[in-house]
């Protein structure tokens, strides 16, 4: 009998990859987005999960408008925290396992080494607070829960909902012909969505419960990441380095939020590849996704 899995937020970059990877591994996987299951409705969530008789639920749904969340924190909290409580309670009632995704933004960025899972959290804005609250709800209600923090997600599928994808933003700006300014004093671990999906399912299959970090390869500044994007894409726009002081945003963001994958590797998973290799994979997958060619 096939294992049965539900993916919430299946229209997004990560959700689309989870559905694809689960099915490739022989799971009977179904994906639901907000139009199909309202995760802020506790009864609707429990009924849907029970009806499908899911063994494992992957929650890739999130409110991720970091700056807008400063103006509407309740909306962020409803999706990133209260809805996670709904999902966790539904999993407890149906005896399903939960895999939930969180963010590097739970840290304040004062570290100068990749963050480990046991480093203290200190979220700086409404979005980050809501994501940390979601982690706490999941841990409070479930023993068999896997929480995966990631950073700077970029994925070729779900492009209709991926306007926040940094790679696509850079490509759009390159076409404009205008100078492109990117901060060089913020460092993260940009993460290729198909690899994140695969490593996460590996952890779930091993029943590696608890908190794990899965980020891209070596830490990289957003300016360096943009430069690598253009090199891999064969583009030569005018790219200029700027700083946080010159490029103000409504929400505060951690200046350093690179994630350590050491715990993931200790349980036997392969290291994440360098960012250039991940970008080469991105553009190859992107071409297939845009053309409709199967992977």
Predicted regions and their residues:
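N-terminal Rossmann NAD(P)H-binding glycine-rich loop of SDR-like oxidoreductase domains
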Residues: 3-22
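Catalytic helix-loop patch of NAD(P)-dependent Rossmann-fold dehydrogenases
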Residues: 71, 78, 82-86, 106-148, ...
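NAD(P)-dependent short-chain dehydrogenase/reductase
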Residues: 136-188, 194-195, 202
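Mid/C-terminal beta-alpha module of Rossmann-like enzyme folds, strongest
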Residues: 199, 206-250, 255, 283-286, ...
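Adenosine-cofactor binding site in Rossmann-like domains, unifying the SAM/SAH pocket
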Residues: 23-47
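C-terminal amphipathic/interface module of NAD(P)-dependent oxidoreductases
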Residues: 255-295
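SDR active-site strand-loop-helix element
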Residues: 8, 32, 60-61, 98-103, ...
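NAD(P)H-binding glycine-rich loop region in Rossmannoid oxidoreductase-like domains
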Residues: 42-79, 90-92
């Amino acid at each position: 009998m096939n294992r049965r899995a539900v993916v919430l937020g299946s229209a997004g970059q990560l959700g689309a990859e989870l559905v694809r990877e689960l099915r490739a591994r022989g799971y009977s996987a179904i994906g639901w987005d907000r139009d199909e299951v309202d995760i802020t409705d506790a009864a609707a969530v429990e009924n849907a999960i029970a009806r499908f008789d899911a063994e494992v639920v992957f929650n890739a749904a999130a409110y991720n408008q970091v700056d807008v969340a400063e103006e509407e924190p309740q909306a962020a909290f409803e999706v990133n925290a209260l809805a996670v409580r709904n999902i966790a309670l539904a999993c407890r009632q149906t005896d399903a396992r939960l895999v939930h995704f969180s963010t590097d933004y739970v840290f304040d960025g004062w570290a100068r080494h990749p963050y480990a899972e046991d480093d203290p959290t200190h979220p700086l804005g409404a979005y980050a607070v809501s994501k940390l609250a979601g982690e706490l709800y999941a841990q409070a209600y479930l023993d068999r829960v896997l929480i995966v923090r990631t950073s700077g997600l970029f994925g070729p599928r779900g492009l209709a909902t991926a306007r926040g994808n940094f790679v696509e933003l850079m490509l759009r700006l390159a076409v404009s012909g205008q100078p492109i300014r990117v901060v060089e004093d913020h460092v993260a671990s940009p993460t290729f969505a198909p690899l994140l999906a695969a490593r996460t399912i590996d952890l779930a299959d091993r029943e590696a419960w608890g908190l794990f970090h899965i980020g891209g390869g070596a830490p990289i500044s957003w300016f360096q990441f943009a430069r690598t994007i253009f090199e891999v894409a064969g583009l030569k726009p005018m790219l200029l380095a700027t700083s946080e002081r010159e490029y103000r945003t409504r929400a505060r963001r951690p200046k350093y939020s690179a994630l350590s994958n050491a715990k993931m590797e200790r349980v036997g998973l392969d290291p994440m590849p360098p960012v250039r290799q991940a970008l080469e994979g991105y553009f190859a997958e992107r071409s297939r996704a845009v053309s409709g060619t199967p992977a």
